[in-house]
Amino acid sequence: MINVTLKGGVVKEFEAGVSAADVAKSIGAGLYRSACAARVDGEACDLRTALDKDCQLEILTFEDKDGRHAFWHTAAHIMAQAIQHLYPAAKFGIGPALDDGWYYDIGGTAPFTPDQFEAIEAEMKKIVKADLPVEKRFITVEEGREIFKGQDYKLELLEEYAEKGWQLSVYTQGDFTDLCAGPHLMSTGAVKAVKLLSAASAYWRGDAARDSLCRMYGTAFPKASELEAHLAMLEEAKKRDHRKLGKELELFTLLEEGPGFPFFLPKGMTLKNTLIDYWREVHHRAGYQEISTPIILSRKLWERSGHWDHYKDNMYTTVIDEEDFAIKPMNCPGGMLVYKTKPRSYRDLPLRVGELGLVHRHELSGALHGLMRVRCFTQDDAHIFMTPDQIKDEIKGVVQLIDQVYSLFGFEYHIELSTMPEDHIGELADWEVATDALRQAIEELGRTYEINEGDGAFYGPKLDFHLVDAIGRTWQCGTIQLDMQMPERFELEYTGEDGQKHRPVMIHRVVFGSIERFIGILIEHFAGAFPTWLAPEQVRVIPIAEAHRGYAQEIERQLDAAGVRVSADLRNEKMGYKIREGQLQRIPYMLVVGAKEMEDGTVSVRARKEENGGVMTLDAFTEMIQKEIAARER
């Protein structure tokens, strides 16, 4: 018999060899029906997995991230099977689950078009109706060569995995078999509602010198109503697309002369600088000091930090005076050098140092996406150097700072604890200490979190903060990384109370993450209708006729002197046209002025939230908007 510890600490006894599915069935029929996968001792696996020793078991449904991934991964296989039925010459690349569906890269046929989606979906529904068992088995490389004969991309992956010494496994459902590690659903019948979304081109393995494949995107849900809600969200997302709104609102542009390098226009710079001013204000109050470090630094520094060995493929390099240099992809090593500029004492700690550093990372051209995925961005890094007994309090302080910032914009969020990856530096014992410190701090704050196994940075575990925007999408922005490796590599020291030299512990952390990406998220979150304090243009003055232009200009001067971002629309256009344009520009307030307003020294207010804001004296309006801006109201 074995003891299985379930969620909530309940321990149940089962015979060795019981499957995770059988355990789910013993808990309740409802859980069994909704189960997608399992997590055994922290690792996601199939429900068919046999439990042969004492373990911790969590049954994963579509409500769990890993459960959704198993669901969508199975749906990707169903799509591939349908395509295999309809287009036997198709050759399959990779087909991973994403955060809201899946894609599959397919060659061997002409690229698919939306006209073909309906037939593929119909074939998928047949496979779902057949409720085919999805079964995993382990194979040898020789068996794999036979199974995937003629499937060139699969054979390439097979040989690569075998060379790395990985255990090879396949999943079979009916007449379709795929090279895959899983996990998957137990059968195809649970995928009730499917939708193919789009097709795009993608190079095999992201290499422009390799074959161009058709990347098919799709999504699926257990219920048709859930699919309908998701498709409605996608339609809303199209309207909010930051690339579209960024152009319409004249915030930024993307040019072929700089792929992945955004150009910020005057209004976009106003927005960016407003965010930066706020960042500086809250960090000053939280006891941070701001620094700036060079963009280009010597190869020796990157070798010392570990980036040259672990991150070089993402770095831009150059040669200066016959010596290798790199444009910084991260701010951390520069922060280490700043710490070393003078001797440090325990009395100096914790030392909180912030930097709005411009970093460059080489991203594949196919991965670039507006401001969300770029090659050049401003990272709001901070590094906190501390003694071991200060770790928990400093982590708590950062969590509270992140909460303060996200709450200002109306974001809810959830937290993930990411643990040691395969490619890491440092001793296991140090990783365990660092991971436990993050866990204890977050638990003492009463915050819930999920474990994200193996997704830590190469130098330490981290807490990732995932925002939920106005239409329910999640975005990973804030990060707290606890690092005991970098201080060792850079030989950082402080003099302790005992007069001896000690090694500080360090936190890397960001709040916005990439400021450019955060702006993209804000554009979509607010659909371009920014809160007044953040809006690039807060007020537009519209004279009714030419005779009122002088009064409009006087209002513009007075509001500008009061610190309000204002413009007067003096064009020879109809008032209705000007008002409509102001609405399209999402300007918080329009002040319409004519003969009566000019005579009375008033303004007719049209607020974005309520079209008729009434008539006010200019002084009263100025006082009102100044208070709104100062309070940073949403």
Description of each model-found segment:
Residues M1-K91, D99, D105-R634:
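NTP/phosphate- and nucleic-acid-binding module
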